[in-house]
Amino acid sequence: MTSTKFIQNKTALITLIAACLVVLISLGVRQTFGLFFSDFKNDLDISLTESGLAVGLQMLMWGLSGPIFGAIADKYGGHKAIMLAFVFYILGIYFLYSGPNTGIFFQIDMGLLVGIGLGGTAISIPMSIVGKHFPLSNRTIAMSLVTAVGSFGYFISPMYTSYSLINNGWIHTLYIFTIFLAVSYTHLRAHETSID
C-alpha cells in the first residue's frame, strides 16, 4: 500500500483553510442568536414567539436554499455559491442592527436572509468543495477537519458573544459579526481562482 501526501498541492491547502474559515464563522455566528433574545425583547420589542418564528423560518430557508446553492456550485463553482450566500448572510446581520429590524423586518432579516445565507455557507457546500481536492485515501480526514472546525465555532462563538454582549452591547456585537462574515467573503474573493 502506497501512502499519499495529505495535502497534494497549494490549491488543496487554500481550499481546506477557506472551507474551515467559512464553516467556523457561519456556524459559529448562527449558534449565538439565542443569546440576543433579551436585547431583542428590550430594545426591539420582539416577543419570544416572534423570535422563535424567525429561527424556525431560518431553519426552513436553510433547508430550502441548500439544494439551490448546490446547483449553483455545480454549474458555476463552489466559491461563487458560497460568496453569494455570504451576501445574504451579511445583509441579514447588517439589517438586524442598522436597518429596519422590527415586526416583519425581523423575520426577513433573521429568518429569511440569514437562513438563505446558511444554505450556502454552512457545512454542505464547503465540505463538497473540500472533497474534490483530496484523494479518496485522505478525503475523510480533510472533511472531518472542516466538521471539527465547525464544532469549534459552536464552542467558541457563544463564549465570545456573552463577553461582547456584556461589555459592548448587542449592536456592537452584531457589527463585529458582520466584519467576521465580510472577512470570510474577502478571503474567498481573493482566492476565487483557486477554489472551485
Which ranges hold each PLM region?
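Glycine-rich segments within core transmembrane alpha-helices of 12-TM secondary carriers
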Residues: T140-P158
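Intracellular juxtamembrane helix-capping segments at the cytosolic ends
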Residues: G120-F134
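Hydrophobic core of transmembrane alpha-helices in multi-pass small-molecule transporters
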Residues: F105-G120
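Residue-level signature of mid-helix packing/kink "hotspots" within the transmembrane helices
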Residues: M59-P67, F155
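Extracytoplasmic
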Residues: T15, L21-S38, I46-L48
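Conserved small/polar residues in nucleotide/adenosyl-binding loops
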Residues: T186-T193
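Helix-to-loop junctions at the C-terminal end of transmembrane segments
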Residues: G66-G77
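C-terminal ends and interior cores of transmembrane alpha-helices
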Residues: F88-N101
